[in-house]
């Protein structure tokens, strides 16, 4: 049971354009966004940041979604794990890869470049932060500093979502 109930979408007509965009990407409007709508200005700001972080041309969208999922795995947020897995599949990540994400370090489904990105995602989402210079050195073998910054941006964006949803005990949609 959620600590704070989400608002009804039909009562948020001014936010409908943003809801429609999210619905195109995810297939539904998350309860987390309907709860964020309780704070004036928060949801549009959050959606703006999300658009920059998740739809930038610096890293591929499927990689961004795998990074988001691994960040949520590292933080332990089940709500975000469900959403990122669902969205990753919609972005073209294979079901085999999604099932193997828990063992990305050894799975044949992941390239060394993907492992480097997922390692940063997993380590940076732990408390205390476990990302090391070794993680960044490994990532630099495959990614530019701009690409690494984009990977960390995804981790940070989902750090907010992981904290929000775990704290609010956001209820997963049907």
Language model features with spans:
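Hydrophobic alpha-helical segments
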Residues: 1-174
């Amino acid at each position: 049971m959620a600590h704070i109930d989400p608002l009804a979408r039909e009562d948020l007509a001014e936010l409908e354009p943003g809801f429609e965009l999210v619905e195109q990407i995810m297939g539904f409007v998350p309860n987390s966004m309907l709860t964020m709508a309780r704070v004036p200005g928060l949801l549009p700001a959050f959606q703006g940041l999300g658009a920059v972080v998740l739809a930038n041309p610096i890293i591929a969208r499927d990689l961004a979604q795998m990074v988001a999922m691994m960040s949520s795995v590292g933080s332990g947020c089940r709500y975000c794990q469900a959403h990122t897995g669902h969205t990753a599949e919609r972005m073209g990540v294979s079901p085999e890869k999604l099932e193997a994400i828990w063992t990305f370090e050894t799975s044949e489904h992941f390239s060394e470049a993907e492992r480097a990105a997922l390692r940063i995602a997993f380590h940076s989402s732990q408390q205390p932060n476990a990302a090391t210079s070794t993680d960044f050195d490994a990532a630099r073998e495959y990614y530019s500093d701009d690409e690494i910054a984009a990977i960390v941006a995804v981790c940070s964006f989902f750090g907010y979502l992981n904290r929000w949803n775990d704290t609010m005990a956001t209820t997963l949609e049907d």
